[in-house]
C-alpha cells in the first residue's frame, strides 16, 4: 500500500483545534496521556495472552520507553502493548466512533473549555494532546501476533489531514514520535521528564524507562575507582516510576495528589474527584478497592452504549477495564480499581457473570459506596448536594431496581418542595420531621419543572392547609414512586391522582356534606358536561382540592397522569388509551354562570363551548397540549367580545 493522504472527520478536527488552541494551560499532561495509553495497551496484550500465548512474541514483560532526542528535537514514547491494525488506526485516530459527538461538541462550544477540561477528558482523546507540544506527530504500530510487515505508519501535522501507509515493524506495540515545537524543547530535558513521570505516572504498573548518560570514574575489578584514569560516559536504562499499585498501599502512605493523579489515569477526567474511597475487604471475599466519585457527570452518562464498570485485577494482573458485574447500573458513574485475591487469572466474561465471588464483591462495594454517600449526606452536606445535582437522577434508578438497598437509598434522595426555595432540597426524613399534627401521608407532584408545578391547581388545598408537597421533576421520578410507596410508615401520595384530600375525619365529613349540597345544585350540569366530553373524560365531579381555579384533570389512583404520558411519548412508547377525571370547583363563579345558563336554555350552544374551554383550560394548566388550538383561541376571542359588549352596555 502506498502512502495515502486522508482528511480527519469534521468532529476530530474540531476536537483537535480545541486541544491545540484552548484546552490546557498545563502542557505536561501530554506525556501522562501517552503513558496512560501505553499502559492500557500493555494491559490488553497481557490479557489476550491468557487465551493466545502467541501474541507475547517472546516478550512477556510490559515496558514503556521514553526516548528524547535533542539533536532531532523529538521525544518518542514506545510500548510493547497490543498495537493496532490499519483498520484500528483509522478507527481510533482518524475518526470518532462515539455517538453523541455533535452534542458533545456543542456542549464544548457553549462553555469556557479551559475552565472545564473534564469535558474533553471524558471523551478519551488523550492522544490528541500530543499536538499541544508538537507540530508533527508520527505513529508506527503493529498488532501483536501479526506479521512484521503488517505494521502501520501514521503521520499528521494537525492541519486537518494525515497520511497512512504500511510499514515494517520488528516488535509488537506502538511507537509515537513527537516533533516538538521550538518553544517546547524543554520536554527533552531529562529532569523535566523525570519530574513529569514521578508526578503523573509513578503508579503505572509497568516500568517507564529512559536511557540516561552519566559521567563516572572507571572502576577496577575490585570495584574501586582507578586513580588518574579520568572519566568516561556511561549510558544505562533507568526506570523512572515506582510501579507500586496505589490501591495496594496503606491509605496513610498515599498522598492526596497521588490519589488525584491515579483518578485521572483511570477515568480520563482532568478534574479532581469529588470523593475517594480506598479500602480492603477481608474474610469470605478478599479484595482491595480504590473507587472515586467524579465531580461532574460525563456527557454520555445516559447513553446505552457507554462503557461502564470499574477496572478488575486479579492479584495485580489486569483482567478488564470495564467490569460491569462489579458495579450496578445505577452506580455507573463510579470509577476505580478492584483487585481480587480469590478469582482465577483466566476468568472469562461468562465466569464474571456467574461467579459467586464477583457477587460478593459487588455486594460489598455497593454497601461501601452507599455508606460513603450517607456519611457525606450527614457530615459534608455541600459536597453531597454537589454530587446529587450531578448524579441524583442515576442514583434514583437504584430505588426502583435494587430492592435489597432500597431503604438505604431512600434516605439519599433529595427533592425540592413547596417549603424550600428554588435550588434548595429536602430529604424524606426532613419532610416527615416537619409534618404537622394530623398529616398522615407524604404528598408529591411530578412534572417537568418546579416553575410549572408551582402553578398547578392541584396544590391549592395543600397550600391552604399548609401541607408540604414534594416537587418531583426528573423523568425517573415516575418510576421512583412506584418503588417507594411509603417512608417511615407514611404512604406517598400523588396530589394529582385519585381522591387525595388532606383532611381529618371530621373535615372529611364536612366536605362530603358540602359536596352533597353542591351536587343538588350542579348535578344535572355535571351530567351535561360529562355527556359533552364523554370521548375525552372518564368522569366529571365536584372538587374538594380546588380553592381558586375553575377546574383540573385528575388521574385514577393507579392511572397515567399527564407527566407520565409526556415521558412515554418522549420515549416513543405507546401511550395506553386512558381518560382522566375532570374536577370542577363548585365555589368558582363560572359554575354559577354555567348553572344559570343551563337552567334557562339547555340547548344553548354556548354551553358546549364552555365545556370545551373548561377541558382545554385544564389541559393547559397541567402543561398538556390541546387538540384544537385554533378553535380554542376563536372561542376565547368570542367570549372576550361578548364580555366587552356587555361591559360597554351594548
UniProtKB/Swiss-Prot annotation:
Disulfide bonds: none annotated. Residues 1-349 are annotated as: A. Residues 350-566 are annotated as: B. GO terms for molecular function: ATP binding; ATP hydrolysis activity; ATP-dependent protein folding chaperone; unfolded protein binding. Keywords: ATP-binding, Chaperone, Cytoplasm, Nucleotide-binding, Stress response. Residues 567-650 are annotated as: C. Signal peptide: none annotated. Its main location: cytoplasm. GO terms for cellular component: cytoplasm. HAMAP family: HSP90 (MF_00505). Molecular chaperone. Has ATPase activity. Belongs to the heat shock protein 90 family. Homodimer. This is Chaperone protein HtpG. It comes from Geobacter metallireducens (strain ATCC 53774 / DSM 7210 / GS-15). The gene is htpG.
Amino acid at each position: 500500500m502506498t502512502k495515502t493522504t486522508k482528511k480527519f472527520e469534521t468532529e476530530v478536527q474540531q476536537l483537535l483545534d480545541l486541544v491545540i488552541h484552548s484546552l490546557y494551560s498545563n502542557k505536561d499532561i501530554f506525556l501522562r496521556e501517552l503513558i496512560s495509553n501505553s499502559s492500557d495497551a500493555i494491559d490488553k496484550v497481557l490479557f489476550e495472552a491468557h487465551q493466545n500465548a502467541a501474541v507475547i512474541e517472546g516478550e512477556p514483560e510490559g515496558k514503556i520507553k521514553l526516548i528524547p532526542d535533542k539533536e532531532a528535537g523529538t521525544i518518542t514514547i514506545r510500548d510493547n502493548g497490543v498495537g493496532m491494525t490499519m483498520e484500528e488506526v483509522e478507527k481510533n485516530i482518524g475518526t470518532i466512533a462515539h455517538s453523541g459527538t455533535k452534542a458533545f461538541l456543542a456542549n464544548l462550544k457553549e462553555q469556557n473549555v479551559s475552565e472545564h477540561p473534564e469535558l474533553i477528558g471524558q471523551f478519551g482523546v488523550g492522544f490528541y494532546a500530543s499536538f499541544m507540544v508538537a507540530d508533527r506527530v508520527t505513529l508506527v504500530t503493529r498488532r501483536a501476533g501479526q506479521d512484521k510487515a503488517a505494521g502501520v505508519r501514521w503521520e499528521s501535522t494537525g492541519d486537518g489531514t494525515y497520511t497512512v501507509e504500511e510499514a515494517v515493524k520488528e516488535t509488537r506495540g506502538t511507537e509515537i514520535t513527537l516533533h516538538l515545537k521550538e518553544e517546547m524543547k524543554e520536554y527533552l530535558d531529562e529532569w523535566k521528564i523525570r519530574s513529569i513521570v514521578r508526578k503523573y505516572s509513578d503508579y503505572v504498573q509497568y516500568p517507564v524507562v529512559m536511557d540516561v548518560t552519566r559521567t563516572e570514574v572507571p572502576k577496577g575489578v575490585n570495584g574501586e575507582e582507578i586513580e588518574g584514569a579520568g572519566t568516561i560516559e556511561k549510558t544505562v536504562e533507568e526506570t523512572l516510576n515506582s510501579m507500586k499499585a496505589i490501591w495496594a498501599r496503606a491509605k496513610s502512605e498515599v498522598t492526596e495528589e497521588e490519589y488525584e493523579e491515579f483518578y485521572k489515569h483511570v477515568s480520563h477526567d482532568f478534574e479532581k474527584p469529588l470523593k475517594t474511597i480506598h479500602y480492603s475487604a477481608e474474610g469470605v471475599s478478599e479484595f482491595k478497592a480504590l473507587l472515586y466519585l467524579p465531580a461532574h457527570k460525563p456527557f454520555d452518562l445516559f447513553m446505552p452504549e457507554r462503557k461502564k464498570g470499574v477496572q478488575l485485577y486479579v492479584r495485580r494482573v489486569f483482567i478488564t477495564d470495564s467490569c460491569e458485574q462489579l458495579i450496578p447500573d445505577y452506580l455507573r458513574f463510579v470509577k476505580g480499581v478492584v483487585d481480587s485475591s480469590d478469582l482465577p487469572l483466566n476468568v472469562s466474561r461468562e465466569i464474571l457473570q456467574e461467579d459467586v465471588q464477583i457477587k460478593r464483591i459487588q455486594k460489598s462495594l455497593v454497601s461501601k459506596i452507599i455508606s460513603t454517600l450517607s456519611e457525606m449526606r450527614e457530615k459534608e452536606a455541600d459536597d453531597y448536594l454537589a454530587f446529587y445535582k450531578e448524579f441524583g437522577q442515576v442514583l434514583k434508578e437504584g430505588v426502583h431496581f435494587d430492592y435489597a438497598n432500597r431503604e438505604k437509598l431512600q434516605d439519599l434522595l433529595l427533592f425540592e418542595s413547596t417549603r424550600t426555595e428554588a435550588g434548595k432540597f429536602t430529604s424524606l426524613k426532613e419532610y416527615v420531621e416537619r409534618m404537622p399534627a394530623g398529616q398522615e401521608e407524604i404528598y408529591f407532584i411530578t412534572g417537568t419543572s418546579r416553575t410549572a408545578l408551582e402553578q398547578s391547581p392541584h396544590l391549592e388545598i395543600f397550600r391552604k392547609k399548609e401541607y408540604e408537597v414534594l416537587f418531583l421533576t426528573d423523568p425517573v421520578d415516575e418510576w421512583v414512586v412506584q418503588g417507594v410507596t411509603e417512608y417511615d410508615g407514611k404512604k406517598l401520595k400523588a396530589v394529582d391522582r385519585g381522591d387525595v384530600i388532606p383532611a381529618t375525619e371530621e373535615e372529611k365529613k364536612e366536605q362530603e356534606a358540602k359536596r352533597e349540597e353542591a351536587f343538588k345544585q350542579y348535578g344535572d350540569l355535571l351530567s351535561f358536561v360529562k355527556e359533552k366530553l364523554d370521548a375525552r373524560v372518564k368522569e366529571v365531579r365536584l372538587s374538594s382540592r380546588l380553592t381558586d381555579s375553575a377546574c383540573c384533570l385528575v388521574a385514577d389512583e393507579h392511572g397515567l397522569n399527564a407527566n407520565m404520558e409526556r415521558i412515554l411519548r418522549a420515549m416513543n412508547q405507546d401511550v395506553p388509551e386512558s381518560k382522566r377525571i375532570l374536577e370542577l370547583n363548585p365555589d368558582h363563579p363560572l359554575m354559577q354562570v354555567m348553572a344559570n345558563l343551563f337552567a334557562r336554555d339547555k340547548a344553548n350552544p354556548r354551553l358546549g363551548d364552555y365545556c370545551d374551554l373548561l377541558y382545554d383550560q385544564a389541559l393547559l394548566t397541567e402543561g398538556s397540549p390541546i387538540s384544537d388550538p385554533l378553535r380554542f383561541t376563536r372561542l376565547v376571542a368570542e367570549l372576550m367580545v361578548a364580555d366587552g359588549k356587555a361591559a360597554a352596555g351594548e
